[in-house]
Amino acid sequence: LAPAPAAAGHGGSDDVRPGATGAPGRAVRLAWAVATIALVGVGSVRAAGWLFVLCLLAAVLTTGLALSGGRTPLGMLVSTVLPPLATARALPWAARGLAARRANGRGFGRILATVAVSIGLLAVFGVLFSSADAIFADLLTDLLPDISASGVTTWTSRWVLIGAGLLGGAYLVTRPPALDGLRGAPAPTVRRLEWALPLAALDALFAAFVLVQLTVLFGGSDHVLRTAGLSYAQYARGGFWQLLAVSALTLLVIGGAVRWAPRGSRTDRVLIRVLLGMLTALSLVVVASALYRMQVYTEAYGATRLRLFVTTVEFWLGLLFVLVGVGVLRLRGGWLPRLVVGTAVAALLGLAAINPDRFIAEHNVDRYRETGRLDVGYLAGLSADAVPALDRLPEPLRSCALRSIAAAGPETGLGTANLGRARARALFTAHPVSAGATCPEAYRW
């Protein structure tokens, strides 16, 4: 993609005003930047590695949107891959900038001198403060990087990658690409019968399923036992994944109908609103049924990471159906792609906010107190975030659940320290884990 042309009056210089190319406004790009900081910041408060990986993957997308913009699906996809590609083009751009600074008497040597003075001041005052307070000295020691040969190599590699990323980001901010013109080829429309008949048939099928679901919801477990011959938990487990797939596929069907259905006549527009509106409303009932099934299943067998994550995904799909319903009624959906990504990021941040590993541990500890059933082996595999909840277990279950977490080490370095691990260390210091506890073998759900 070619960068946007220079703003008028700048004579083709590199100083192009961000947002001058029709990309999302500064407020939208600032929102993506804030989302990126929040996603990366999850690692400073949560110890769950699986959660941080998901947040980093989402941050890759939001970083591209913050730097490059993009409103259409294709533009948003391209913005994701632009930052690493921009690094190569940023190198000659940075070289020209440094040459211009030297010509103006502001060479790179003065920048290095400023950095050297800053490091010197930090070193002198850091040594004085460390010698004055032992606690501050321990904190500073934990934050200092490893100065061994392997440590220096690791940190040098990291800073080179970070510097390259920052350079590419600076290039995109000063020379934003024009992504709003990236749209797919116009889709050919089909005749009314070719899209209305399949949608009407699908609406009828959804309506029949929804009637059955309402019967189950109001009839309860007795109705399921009489008609399906299954326990309520087995019934819930058997259908959740299918309903999750139905929810995702329905969104694809709606997207295809919106793309290929004609809207030239008033009759076509009314049919789109009625058929797609009905499908969207019925899909919300399917989402509610899936969520109810997962609730029953979790109450019967306990909470796990997978069950909590797919529940979050199902809530997100329900929100998408609401947004799609609004777009169908208005027959406008240009804002939907950004809201799809935005709501996904919000759902992920919401999952991080509830502290999923601790939430899972608390749910299972409460369930143990009510039923006496507990999967100690699974809980022992949770992260340090779960320690405050697992600390409520009686011995020897407490030590059995916390032993592997405590043995993982303090992890106080700059790259691994976070709030979750700090809380766990404090609890282990106050209530050490018993190394000689005998762990029961048959605590499974």
Predicted stretch roles:
Residues 372-381, 389-393:
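Structural detector for internal amphipathic alpha-helices that build alpha-solenoid repeat scaffolds
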